[in-house]
C-alpha cells in the first residue's frame, strides 16, 4: 500500500465510525516524520478510543501495522504511527490546543471529499 493509499484507508476507517472534521495533510515535502498526517476529531474519550481502535484494526486487516501507538491511557489524543502516515485522533479541546493545522500550515491538504460522507 502506498503512503497515500494508507492515509485514505485511515480516512475511510475514521469516517465509518463518524469521526468529525477529518483532514489529510501531505507533509513529505516538509519533514521526514511522515508523508501524511490524518487528523480527526471525536466527541468523547470513548469515541477517541473507538476511532483509533477501528482505524488500527482496519489497517491491520490490510496488512499495515502501526509502529507506535501513543495516548491510549489519556484518551484526549491518540496517535497511530504507521511510519509514512501518522493518524491523530483528538478530542476537540486537544485538537484546538495543539493546532496541528497551524503548525503544519505549509502542508498540502489532500482532497478527501469523495471518501468522507457529509455529516
Can you say where each PLM-predicted feature lies in the sequence?
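Long, contiguous binding/interaction regions
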Residues: 1-24, 28-29, 43-50, 57-60, ...
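A short, glycine/Asx- and small/polar-enriched loop/turn
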Residues: 32-35, 81-84
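Short hydrophobic/aromatic beta-strand micro-patches
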Residues: 39-41
